[in-house]
Amino acid sequence: VSEDGFRYIYDKIKKDVHLSSISGGTDIISCFVLGNLFQPVYAGEIQNRGLGMDVDIFDENGSSIKNTKGELVCKKPFPSMPIKFWNDEGDKKYKAAYFEKYRNVWHHGDFAKVTSKGGFVIFGRSDTTLNPGGVRLGTAEIYNEVEKFEEIQESIVIGQSWKNDIRIILFVVLN
């Protein structure tokens, strides 16, 4: 849940609820990060790592980073980790799905950061991340801003190769 989502719920729905979000998946039958009733809630942040999850945020080189956007990873095997895909000879698809980006580290595919308070912020899927001029920008960040305009009914953002770089193009449908 985004910071704006937290504010909306606390302002418009219920002020005294312990709101939390998650990041996980059906493939792992679990959460990498999730809420914790015993920790404070900070708008837009997920409080904790999941039980048995050695979760971290990596930069492009596989180094651990704090307060900077990067890739959500799990550095060690975990209890509910799938061990293979059915009919995947030589585990090629399995390795490509989770272990291709960082050697022997599970790459979840979420663009995230760990904050100075120890919470996690999820910005969207990293496979929908654009990289113009070497600056990583999640499409969710663009959509979050575009959705603030009542005049816009729908939008889609793409990255286009242009002059040895990537440029961002936003298409909109007006109301």
Cite the ranges covered by each PLM segment.
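AMP-binding/adenylate-forming catalytic core of the ANL superfamily
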Residues: 78, 104-175
